Curated annotation (Swiss-Prot):
Active-site residue numbers: 130
Binding site residues for NAD(+): 12-15, 161-169, 272
Signal peptide coordinates: none
Protein name (database record): Acetaldehyde dehydrogenase
Length: 307
């Protein structure tokens, strides 16, 4: 059996707990710690039941054990407001930080677009936002064919899937996502909108992507590029589905998506969680495989987590 890279989860909320389930079935990652601030949180209880060490004393409760437990990678699923300090403390101990907050201290990563181009020596990688992970691949699919003058994304998510951390970071969400639409998606100007839908029963994550190309769009080439990108995202998020499009109207290209989650921690309507945590796990597996010098792929099935 291949040895595994040990990792820690910081944040015991929706995102951290969903990520836990994905890491438990990894071939190259071994979650050994979960950090929270609420001793009664469901996430800490689930982590402890899965055999992880847990602390409710925040990041400072983990630091004394980092070296002894050989933690090499940490995932921060807390808040943009505290991420910088979390990252500084762990980076000083040689831990690579994968940031699931909108803090955007390190370079952005959207796996099918730029994962392979990331510098191996960076110590902080930002996973943009759930809306960014869902929509930026589509902006990139268009911009890889021809120049995109303006890219606008609208991410609609179920209210039940949005925890307190995300609600506190709405402004950071829109700024960070818009920036990544430009930097990673390739649009000259980007805009991001998030809609938190209170409908019951909860709806699946839905995303709309508008791209304004500089020239008349090459409909055949853009359509082929979009379908190819959909397949790449589906390798780690099987519920990522093109519902309509690309629809062409003059220079405007519109794409409609739906994202269904695996139902690891929250129900399947929380595709916004699933695409974020799956992207983070995929990124960490790439880092771990380089540390171990092995080839690997993310196991996306649920059953292995409980085996």
């Amino acid at each position: 059996m291949t040895s595994k890279i040990k990792c820690a989860l910081i944040g015991s909320g929706n995102i951290g707990t969903d990520l836990l389930y994905k890491l438990l079935r990894s071939d190259v990652l071994e979650p050994v710690w979960m950090v929270g601030i609420d001793p009664d949180s469901d996430g800490l209880a689930k982590a402890k039941a899965a055999g992880l060490k847990v602390t409710a004393d925040g990041i400072d409760g983990l630091l004394p054990f980092v070296e002894a437990d050989e933690i090499k990678i940490a995932f921060d699923a807390t808040s943009a407001y505290v991420h910088a300090e979390n990252s500084r403390k762990l980076n000083e101990l040689g831990v690579v930080m994968i940031d699931l907050t909108p803090a955007a201290i390190g370079p952005f990563c959207v796996p099918p677009v730029n994962l392979e181009q990331l510098d191996e020596n960076i110590n902080n990688i930002n996973m943009v936002t759930c809306g960014g992970q869902a929509t930026i691949p589509m902006v990139a699919a268009v911009s890889q064919v021809q120049a995109v003058e303006y890219g606008e994304i609208v991410a609609t998510v179920s209210s039940r899937s949005v925890g307190p951390g995300t609600r506190q970071n709405i402004d950071e969400f829109t700024r960070t996502t818009a920036g990544a639409v430009e930097q990673i998606g390739g649009a000259e100007k980007g805009k991001a909108i998030i809609v938190i839908n209170p409908a019951e029963p909860p709806l699946l994550m839905r995303d709309t992507i508008h791209c304004l190309t500089k020239d008349q769009p090459d409909e055949q080439a853009i359509t082929a590029s979009v379908h190819k990108m959909i397949e790449q995202v589906q390798q780690y998020v099987p519920g990522y589905t093109l519902k309509n499009g690309p629809v062409f109207d003059g220079r405007k290209v519109t794409i409609f998506l739906e994202v269904e989650g695996l139902g690891d921690y929250l129900p399947k309507y929380a595709g916004n969680l699933d695409i974020m945590t799956a992207a983070a796990a995929r990124t960490a597996e790439m880092l771990a495989s380089k540390m171990l010098n092995v080839k690997t792929h993310l196991n996306v099935t649920k059953e292995a987590a409980l085996a």
